[in-house]
């Protein structure tokens, strides 16, 4: 988007340049057209950042600097006809900044006052410098080739979320920020903790992450400063290894870049749907302290945050930044919101609460009984599970961040980054509940009946996790002539210690019920008996990722559009996963929970990549990239990518990409899936027959009694993908841009869990037979059986308007439309159209911002389309059809942020969900809302105070 060549280049430096020709000083002769042409400037006084943006727009300059360099600084009015270089010098000197020229229209601003220069626009040229201008080294997501312009249109669509947009959003976590982006789907920690599905009562792996384009989190690669990070220490049965976004404090994030489309040729495995690159802050002048406090309009879900960071410049021109952050959030239970219930009668969908009491073997309720239940349940004996479940876990997070950038010798720099953090998180589930077969002879035994029972006397199921993260990187970089190089070593570690209270041990339950010690009729049970029945369950997970990388980049040969630039590098990695579940889980002695197995695995990998940028003319460029990866146990994988960019007219750019991608099986997937080992009756089919134990339940109704379990699959292969994007970017005038892109991603060999009951041909290893060939068991395992084909559109509109008296107005609108989402569960099956099911097929995010003097006000809106209830195969469920509730309606939420800044201070008020929208969801299994999309807090107020030192 061409307008960002000015506006975004100012708001954040994202550039590397390897200039070999001498660069003139500001105002020197031969500085190019920008220095020679005089411009009638009309720049009102006010914030220095706005004044510089206006100067860049009016003069056609490109200014590069850190955003914190201009924060709190003021500029005087400038209404004169001057050479652009002289005008820039005047603004910079008044603010105590130094200016260095890169070329005729590109300048770098840094701290400190340059030596006094003569006022005339043209000054004597100083001696030519011996090396390139010292511009900070940062890369654009989607390529290893440094770019000299943050706003240059790239072949792949890239969304940039700036620091100012992060602050105006009011989001306090990286997870909240990303899940609000169009085309992103959030995976909430409460949902992730449902280990194995909603029927499993073991809340595990409470990580928070997001995914792009409905392909799941394992197809989205998350990077921090361009490097991979370790996954969350515990693994999710449904989602596998996850990058925990909440482990990265939003206060230390400089910006976020989202590249959509395949990028395995650049970054290797996992980047099939896209890449999210989280860029951390590196430079700051002085100290900055921030205090925030927020609560819902109902006075609950409170959160508070304190952070402090301090940066300085070293004697040799380097930078040091250290920061500390503490975040506290209170738990929000479902009982605090009326809409969080399984009672859907208000929508005509019936009451789905669980009646507690005795049932006969035909499941008829004989009488209600809910001993030990609280008063609000005892009246009706109805268990409303969502009322007991956390809408928001309680959390306490502490983080420490440090950065050092230090020149060692002429042309060689040392960079050290360190990030450490701890997090205590607690979430609550309903009391453990099950259908109990009370043995004959027990005082509460009823003939020919079982008891639907909730263990209220044990208490709710609670999961507490203690997470510790450590990320460190040491890198050297430098220049040799026009060529740049870097070498980096990084270590990433995530450890989770989790404890679950409130579960029931199988053997202890059998013992106390056989002995008649535990009473179901309300007779108080001794605390010692309850403690023996429900022992705490602990587990530990460690995920470690170690990386070594070297790369070089520079000009190769001359082309009509400029020098061809190339980048090449080598990456080595070691991925380690250790999982130590509680012995009771290993022995499958926890009721209604999947059996867990210890994991102690590691995987090594290596990758070699090369990229080249070919500017065949000023209007036509081609990017080529290729990467070869070797993963231990899975051989070699080659991933190419091509990108094209053509500008037939000034301000109009057509672009396209084509790429392949892959994802090697994770260490989690090389193991058995989490399955509850149990006996089951399955219909006898020709594929299953003969069965060792057959039951005839009616005419032509033959069922096999089998043991359900799981196994590993040594023949697992990597998933593969092909993707392309086609689009255009239009910037007819400075200050306005628009882009529209179409994407398609086809993922094959998808790794999915399943068994012979899903498809016997797709899972041939699933059948377990005895020595006579009769079926005795069915094992589930991971196999390469799935396929997904997703197509859609993305757009982005941005505009900036300056007024003489009323300040600056900024408008942005971005959206995503999922035109097609087809899935095939097993080979040969019919493709099912999932677009609009489970999640909306359209989403949009926009804002209008006003800035004048020290004031800033932002009104933002997030809109989501409707969601179909049911499934593509089964359609709308009958109760929903009868009630006319086959589609959950879409919604729009409005937020408001206002801030005022004066020297060294900034105060802001953010109001989330101004209209206090009540969630609505007609999928009766979701308990009244969609945890991936809705914010259960409702209207939320957040007050922030910042002080610069």
Question: Where are the regions that the model predicts?
Answer:
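Short loop/turn motifs that connect adjacent beta-strands in outer-membrane beta-barrel proteins
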Residues: 283-286, 314-317, 408-412, 479-484, ...
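N-terminal export/assembly leaders
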Residues: 21-118
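N-terminal plug
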Residues: 30-31, 51-54, 62-66, 86-89, ...
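Gram-negative outer-membrane beta-barrel transporters
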Residues: 737-872, 946
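C-terminal beta-signal and adjacent terminal beta-strands/loops
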Residues: 819, 861-876, 899-949
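Surface-exposed, low-complexity loop segments enriched in small/polar and acidic residues
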Residues: 237, 338-345, 364-395, 401, ...
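Outer-membrane beta-barrel translocator/receptor signature
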Residues: 187, 238-243, 251-254, 265-276, ...
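Non-catalytic regulatory/gating segments with a bias toward low-complexity or hydrophobic composition
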Residues: 166, 178, 256, 276-278, ...
């Amino acid at each position: 988007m061409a307008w960002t060549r000015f506006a975004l280049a100012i708001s954040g430096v994202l550039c590397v340049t390897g200039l070999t020709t001498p660069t003139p000083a500001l105002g020197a002769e031969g500085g190019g057209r920008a220095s020679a042409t005089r411009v009638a400037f009309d720049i009102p006084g006010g914030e220095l950042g706005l004044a510089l943006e206006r100067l860049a727009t009016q003069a056609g300059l490109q200014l590069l600097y850190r955003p914190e360099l201009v924060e709190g600084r003021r500029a005087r009015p400038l209404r004169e006809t001057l050479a652009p270089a002289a005008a820039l010098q005047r603004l910079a000197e008044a603010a105590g900044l130094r200016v260095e020229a890169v070329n005729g229209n590109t300048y770098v601003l840094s701290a400190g006052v340059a030596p006094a220069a003569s006022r005339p626009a043209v000054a004597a040229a100083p001696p030519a410098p011996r090396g390139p201008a010292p511009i900070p080294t940062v890369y654009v997501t989607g390529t290893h080739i440094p770019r000299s312009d943050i706003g240059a249109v790239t072949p792949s669509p890239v969304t940039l979320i700036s620091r100012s947009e992060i602050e105006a959003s009011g989001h306090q976590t990286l997870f909240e920020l990303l899940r609000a982006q169009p085309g992103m789907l959030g995976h909430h920690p409460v949902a992730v903790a449902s280990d194995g599905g909603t029927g499993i009562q073991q809340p595990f792996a409470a990580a928070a992450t997001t995914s792009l384009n409905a392909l799941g989190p394992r197809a989205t690669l998350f990077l921090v400063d361009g490097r991979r990070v370790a996954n969350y220490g515990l693994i999710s049965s449904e989602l596998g290894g996850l990058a925990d976004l909440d482990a990265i404090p939003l206060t230390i994030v400089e910006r976020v870049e989202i590249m959509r489309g395949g990028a395995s040729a650049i970054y290797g495995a996992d980047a099939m749907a896209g890449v999210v690159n989280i860029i951390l802050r590196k430079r700051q002048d002085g100290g900055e302290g921030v205090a925030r406090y927020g609560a819902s309009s109902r006075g609950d879900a409170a959160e508070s945050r304190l952070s402090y960071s301090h940066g300085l410049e070293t004697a040799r021109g380097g930078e040091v930044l250290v920061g500390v952050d503490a975040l506290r959030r209170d738990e929000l239970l479902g009982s605090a919101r009326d809409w969080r219930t399984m009672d859907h009668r208000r929508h005509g969908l019936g009451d789905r609460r669980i009646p507690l009491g005795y049932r006969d073997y035909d499941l008829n309720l004989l009488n209600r009984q809910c001993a030990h239940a609280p008063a609000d349940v005892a009246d009706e004996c109805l268990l409303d599970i969502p009322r007991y479940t956390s809408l928001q876990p309680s959390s306490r997070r502490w983080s420490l961040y440090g950065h050092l950038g230090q020149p060692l010798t002429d042309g060689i720099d040392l960079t050290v980054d360190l990030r450490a953090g701890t997090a205590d998180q607690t979430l609550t589930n309903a009391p453990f509940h099950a259908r109990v077969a009370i043995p004959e002879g027990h005082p509460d035994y009823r003939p020919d009946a079982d008891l639907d029972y909730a263990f209220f006397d044990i208490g709710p199921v609670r999961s507490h996790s203690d997470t510790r993260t450590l990320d460190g990187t040491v890198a050297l970089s430098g220049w040799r002539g026009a060529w740049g190089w870097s070498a980096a070593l990084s270590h990433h570690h995530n450890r989770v210690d989790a404890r679950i209270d409130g579960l029931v041990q199988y053997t202890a339950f059998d013992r106390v019920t056989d002995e008649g010690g535990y009473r179901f009729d309300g007779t108080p049970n001794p605390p010692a008996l309850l403690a023996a029945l429900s022992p705490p369950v602990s587990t530990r997970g460690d995920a470690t990722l170690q990386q070594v990388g070297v790369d070089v980049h520079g000009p190769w040969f001359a082309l009509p559009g400029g020098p061809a630039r190339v980048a090449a590098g080598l990456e080595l990695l070691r991925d380690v996963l250790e999982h130590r579940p509680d012995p009771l889980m290993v022995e499958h002695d926890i009721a209604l929970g999947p059996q867990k197995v210890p994991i102690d695995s590691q995987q090594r990998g290596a990758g070699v990549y090369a990229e080249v940028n070919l500017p065949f003319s000023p209007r036509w460029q081609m990017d080529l990239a290729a990467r070869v990866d070797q993963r231990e146990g899975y051989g070699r994988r080659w991933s190419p990518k091509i990108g094209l960019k053509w500008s037939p007219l000034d301000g109009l750019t057509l672009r396209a990409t084509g790429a392949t991608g892959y994802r090697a099986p994770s260490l989690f997937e090389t193991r058995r899936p989490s399955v509850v080992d149990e006996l089951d009756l399955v219909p006898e089919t020709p594929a299953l027959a003969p069965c060792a134990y057959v039951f005839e339940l009616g005419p032509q109704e033959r069922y096999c009694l089998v043991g359900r379990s799981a196994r590993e699959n040594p023949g697992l292969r990597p998933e593969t993908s092909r993707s392309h994007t086609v689009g255009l970017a239009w910037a007819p005038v400075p200050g306005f841009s628009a882009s529209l892109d179409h994407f398609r991603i086809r993922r094959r060999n998808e790794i999915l869990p399943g068994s012979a009951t899903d498809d016997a041909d797709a899972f041939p290893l699933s059948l377990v037979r005895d020595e006579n060939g009769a079926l005795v068991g069915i094992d589930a395992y991971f196999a390469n059986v799935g396929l997904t084909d997703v197509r859609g559109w993305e757009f982005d509109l941005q505009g900036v308007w300056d007024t003489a008296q009323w300040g600056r107005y900024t408008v942005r609108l971005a959206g995503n439309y999922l035109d097609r989402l087809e899935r095939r569960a097993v080979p040969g099956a019919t493709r099912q159209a999932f677009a609009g099911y489970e999640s909306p097929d359209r989403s949009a995010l926009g804002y209008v911002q006003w800035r004048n003097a020290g004031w800033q006000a932002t009104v933002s809106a997030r809109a989501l389309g409707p969601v179909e209830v049911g499934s593509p195969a089964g359609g709308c469920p009958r109760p929903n059809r009868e009630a006319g509730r086959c589609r959950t309606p879409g919604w729009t939420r409005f937020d408001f942020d206002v801030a005022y800044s004066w020297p060294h201070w900034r105060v802001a008020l953010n109001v989330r969900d101004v209209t206090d929208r009540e969630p609505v969801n007609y999928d009766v299994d979701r308990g009244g809302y969609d945890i991936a999309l809705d914010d259960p807090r409702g209207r939320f107020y957040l007050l922030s105070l910042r002080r610069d030192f």
